[in-house]
Swiss-Prot record:
The chain crosses the membrane at residues 4-24. Mitochondrial membrane ATP synthase (F(1)F(0) ATP synthase or Complex V) produces ATP from ADP in the presence of a proton gradient across the membrane which is generated by electron transport complexes of the respiratory chain. F-type ATPases consist of two structural domains, F(1) - containing the extramembraneous catalytic core and F(0) - containing the membrane proton channel, linked together by a central stalk and a peripheral stalk. During catalysis, ATP synthesis in the catalytic domain of F(1) is coupled via a rotary mechanism of the central stalk subunits to proton translocation. Belongs to the ATPase protein 8 family. This is ATP synthase protein 8. InterPro entries: ATP_synth_su8_fun (IPR009230). The gene is atp8. F-type ATPases have 2 components, CF(1) - the catalytic core - and CF(0) - the membrane proton channel. The lineage of its organism: Eukaryota, Fungi, Dikarya, Ascomycota, Pezizomycotina. It is a single-pass membrane protein. It is found in: Mitochondrion membrane. Its main location: mitochondrion. The keyword Flavoprotein does not apply. It comes from the Eukaryota. GO terms for cellular component: mitochondrial membrane; proton-transporting ATP synthase complex.
Length: 48
């Protein structure tokens, strides 16, 4: 069973941590500001 090998567990943890940090960075830098801009423009359009 590969789950009992310590290197397998460390490998899984490291890859999960790296993928999570990359996803969080991508969301905060690229994806979420677009949604914020869309919502702000909707608010301004509705106030007209």
């Amino acid at each position: 069973m590969p789950q009992l090998v310590p290197f397998f567990f460390v490998n899984q943890v490291v890859y999960a941590f790296v993928i999570l940090t990359v996803l969080i960075y991508a969301f905060t830098k690229f994806i979420l500001p677009k949604f914020v801009r869309i919502f702000i423009s909707r608010i301004y359009i509705n106030k007209l």
